[in-house]
Amino acid sequence: MRTLRIMTLLIIGFGCMQAQTRALHARSFELTQTAAGSPLQAGNSITDVVVSNDTIWLGTGKGLSRSINGGRSWKNYYDTPEFGKEDISAVAFRGKDVWVATAHTVDKDGQSLPEGSGLRYSSDAGETWKVISQPVDVNNVDTLFWNSKSTIRALGITTAINNITYDIAIAGNAVYICSFAGMARVSTDTGKTWQRVIIPPDNLTSIGPNDSLVFDLSPSGGALNLQNNLNHRAFSVYAENDSTIWIGSAAGLNKTMNRGRSWLHFSKQTQTNPISGNFVVAIGQQRTNTKNIIWAATINATDNTEKRGVSFSEDGGISWKQTLLGEFAHNFGFKNDVVYVPTDNGVFRSGDLGQSWVQTGTIFDKTTRQRYTQSKFFGAASNGDTVWLGGGDGLVKTIDNISTPFGSSWSILHASRPLPSATETYSYPNPFAPDDEVVRLHYATGKPSPASVTIRIFDFGMNLVRTLIQNASRLPGTEHDEIWDGKDDSGNQIVNGVYFYQIVVENDEPRWGKILAIQ
């Protein structure tokens, strides 16, 4: 499949585990509209959804998108001088300050590896941008000051490969980033300089400003024989306020309440009521009328007692409750007492602190007759009663209130190129991988009234493979998508190759298009 999915290989002890963090998708064949005022977002692979009032920011496989009118129109930044064709790996904004991390893959020694390509910063809500290189170090080993009794040896990260920023948090004049091999870093001068954040090693539950410390700040020992600390492999960060910062790693959660002068370290092994697993890929905060709750996506790491799931704390991390055990959660969205959790198996909703959950089933847009074809979701956010969800098959909107319960009505937004004329057609994505995605056939009837449409798929030898629809009525004045899942009329998955599709509207001449299937 022609997609970039960051599969981070965590070398842990004598074994390894492969963990999918926030997925990045870069389909060069994915369709987009980059002009300002586009009715649709830039891409259909959405990894980040961030909302404040009517402003919505999306991180997609086709760059960054912004709406300032509740999703009615979008400004897309893909292929602009500042963003180029980079993937978006993280988005954060506060007021008019916006921070965006970008990434791509590089081929090295026969492997396709993730590489951080820097950050973009805007102080005027996305009107202008400053390009910042991915933070790297000059030396292989540095010495960092902690106090008069302690200096910390720190591994120097001299490459952007595997140094990819997965999360960003803004706290006052400070911006925090978590970049896996690049560790956690902070800048207080809008990205001109970056300092490594010193957090506890694996074997300590806290560090303070007066402690005598002996450890290495290093996510990997390597040839330099430094201490290997999974807690320094940083994946997620959240600013509860300007002083209280949470950092999630491959060894649990870290919390400071004084801007990094001291840290607490929470893990599965060190608390009576702990998190479910130590690999923390997302952190969020829910503020209700009576509670302040920290939520974390806590995935199993090295200990076989750990479980993937969601953990939440109502007392600042002293104790945790576990829920959605068995689910791989990617992020959180909130609406007062309600929490939304995008996972590999759809989006889960709870209004009672995880005691009960409602899971999205089939997502079908009754207006466009479109079905959401992917189960994985990576982003969730709300604007009043409107809930926005992002995943591998576009952007989804639903209403969640008493009169319109969550999931009772869906709107699916797919980025697509407008047809040059009503008699033309195209398919997307093309090529497509039938083992894990669908292809959409895009067309319009070109008729002034409802028309009968038949669509057939043929192989390279012009043998009939599938009749998608036959004499189906389609409305005028709009463009349609019909989904092909890469199966024939008997339900068998097709083989790689070139396929042709035929669209017949009423008794008009057939319209033809070509699809390349690669898996």
Describe these PLM feature segments.
Residues 21-37, 65-81, 116-136, 185-202, ...:
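Asp-box/BNR beta-propeller loop motif
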Residues 34-65:
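Beta-strand-rich domains and repeat architectures in extracellular enzymes and scaffolds
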Residues 498-519:
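C-terminal tail/sorting-segment detector
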Residues 419-428, 432-456, 509:
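Glycine-centered coil/turn sites that cap beta-strands in beta-rich domains
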Residues 55-58, 98-99, 175-177, 185, ...:
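Conserved beta-propeller blade signature
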Residues 35, 79-82, 131-159, 197-228, ...:
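Surface-exposed loop and turn segments in beta-propeller and other repeat-based domains
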Residues 464-494, 505-511:
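Glycine-centered tight-turn motifs at strand-turn-strand junctions
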